[in-house]
Design a protein with these regions (language model features):
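Core of compact, soluble alpha-helical bundle domains
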Residues: 3-145
């Protein structure tokens, strides 16, 4: 089995000082992306949504949305509140009991692409995010198919 390269913790768009968090417009834009992502998943990828904690049938739990929001803010180079509250993300460990194959990876990426579209994220930052999300989604696969 070929081991996938481990993604870097905080992505950088260039050698400049701006982080993806800054380029996206900060906290409110990132949290809007998270809401659009989970809304798209609930609407378009119900099998993937069902792998998450639910508040009601078909509704991904607020705690999951909030936790991913904190994680994404930090991962994009913003405040490290996730680390302060939850420790190191340890993505593979935290997702280890969730069956993630190619179908789940692709459903996750479709949900994120829909959210990025809905939030109007375009240009170089979009290309960068598409690439980085694909790398991380593939890294988290723990099933062959």
């Amino acid at each position: 089995t070929r081991r996938r390269a481990r993604p870097r913790h905080t992505p950088r768009v260039s050698a400049g000082l701006e982080t993806p968090y800054d380029l996206l417009g900060g906290r409110e834009r990132v949290l809007a992306l998270v809401e659009a992502f989970y809304d798209a998943m609930e609407r378009d990828e119900p099998d993937l949504a069902a792998l998450h904690r639910m508040d009601a049938p078909g509704k991904i739990a607020r705690v999951s949305r909030d936790r991913f929001g904190l994680f994404l803010i930090g991962w994009l180079g913003g405040p490290q509140d996730y680390m302060a509250q939850h420790g190191h993300p340890r993505l593979r460990m935290r997702h280890g009991e969730v069956p993630i194959g190619i179908a789940q990876r692709d459903a996750w990426l479709r949900s994120m692409a829909s959210a990025l579209d809905q939030c109007g994220i375009v240009g170089p930052i979009r290309g960068f995010l598409d690439q980085r999300f694909a790398e991380v989604a593939d890294f988290l696969r723990n099933r062959p198919g």
